[in-house]
Structures are given as structure tokens and as C-alpha cells.
Amino acid sequence: MKWETPTATDLRFGFEITMYVSAR
């Protein structure tokens, strides 16, 4: 899944942070 839009990139970054915190 590759996103080019800045909004999608920011959303993906936030999603990774959420997954990281949930994985703790």
C-alpha cells in the first residue's frame, strides 16, 4: 500500500504510532 498524498502519509504515521503503543 503506497500513498502519495501528505494527508495519507500523516495518517499512516499516526496509525503506526497507535499500533506501536498498542503493541507495548
Curated annotation (Swiss-Prot):
There is a cross-link at E16-Y20 (Pyrroloquinoline quinone (Glu-Tyr)). InterPro entries: PQQ_synth_PqqA. The keyword Lipid metabolism does not apply. Pathway: Cofactor biosynthesis; pyrroloquinoline quinone biosynthesis. GO terms for biological process: pyrroloquinoline quinone biosynthetic process. It comes from the Bacteria. Keywords: PQQ biosynthesis. Required for coenzyme pyrroloquinoline quinone (PQQ) biosynthesis. PQQ is probably formed by cross-linking a specific glutamate to a specific tyrosine residue and excising these residues from the peptide. Belongs to the PqqA family. NCBIfam families: PQQ_syn_pqqA (TIGR02107). This is Coenzyme PQQ synthesis protein A. It comes from Variovorax paradoxus (strain S110). The lineage of its organism: Bacteria, Pseudomonadati, Pseudomonadota, Betaproteobacteria, Burkholderiales.
